[in-house]
Amino acid sequence: MDTTKAYIEIVIPIDSIQLKGNLRHAENSKGIILFSHGSGSSRLSSRNNYVAYYLLKHGFSSLLFDLLTQEEDTIYENRFDIQLLTDRLVKVTKWIRENSETKHLPIGYFGSSTGAASALSAAAQLDDTITAIVSRGGRPDLAMPA
């Protein structure tokens, strides 16, 4: 099963940067799942792409995107800056809400590792915008204030 060809590459403008993403859009989509991946991972993760492909086959759209630019990812501390990751996820979620193709879809988060912490924090900030959160091997403890 080739899970890498089922998406379109997009660029999401966030403040002064652009985040790269892979959007899979299901026909008659039931919702869209935003992936908030963990430290050291990316939108190209074979594991997350498999999950996104599975979701597509079951009627869910998905967006795998990099929370950090390539330059930012070279700074190790950024991978654990939960506030930065949360801010990015909130802004991408708002972008999804403003996009004509996705604004009508219920939104869920799929977080792994440190991405689970940013998913929980972002969902708390966005009130009732997020309808579901999945944490796979997550670090929810990092979502709590220090």
Which stretches of residues belong to each language-model region?
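Primarily recognizes the serine-hydrolase "nucleophile elbow" in alpha/beta-hydrolase
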Residues: 89-146
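Short, hydrophobic/aromatic-rich segments at coil-to-beta transitions
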Residues: 2-10
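Solvent-exposed alpha-helices and their adjacent loops that cap or buttress functional pockets
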Residues: 2-3, 27, 100, 126
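Serine-hydrolase catalytic machinery in alpha/beta-hydrolase-like enzymes
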Residues: 10-105
